[in-house]
Amino acid sequence: MARNDIRPIIKLKSTAGTGYTYVTRKNKRNNPDRISLKKYDPVVRKHVEFREER
């Protein structure tokens, strides 16, 4: 099995419209749907929701 089969690299994009992204990995087997996490956006200096971008 290749390294990226089960845990691919994904981008989390800010919903605040700043264009700020986080890069992380996710387990496709445990989380087949798109991820949304609350993380810090330094552009607006707030915690906002980040959604998975494909």
UniProtKB/Swiss-Prot annotation:
GO cellular-component terms in the record? cytosolic large ribosomal subunit
**Molecular function via GO:** structural constituent of ribosome
**Is this entry keyworded Ribosomal protein?**
yes
Q: What residues form the membrane-spanning segments?
A: none
Which keywords does this chain's UniProt record carry? Answer: Ribonucleoprotein, Ribosomal protein
In terms of SUPFAM superfamilies, this protein maps to: Zn-binding ribosomal proteins (SSF57829)
Q: Which domain of life is it from?
A: Bacteria
Q: Which InterPro entries match?
A: Ribosomal_bL33, Ribosomal_bL33_CS, Ribosomal_bL33_sf, Ribosomal_zn-bd
GO BP terms: namely: translation
- What does the similarity note say? Belongs to the bacterial ribosomal protein bL33 family.
Its protein name is: Large ribosomal subunit protein bL33
Q: Which organism is it from?
A: Corynebacterium diphtheriae (strain ATCC 700971 / NCTC 13129 / Biotype gravis)
Report which gene this protein is encoded by. rpmG
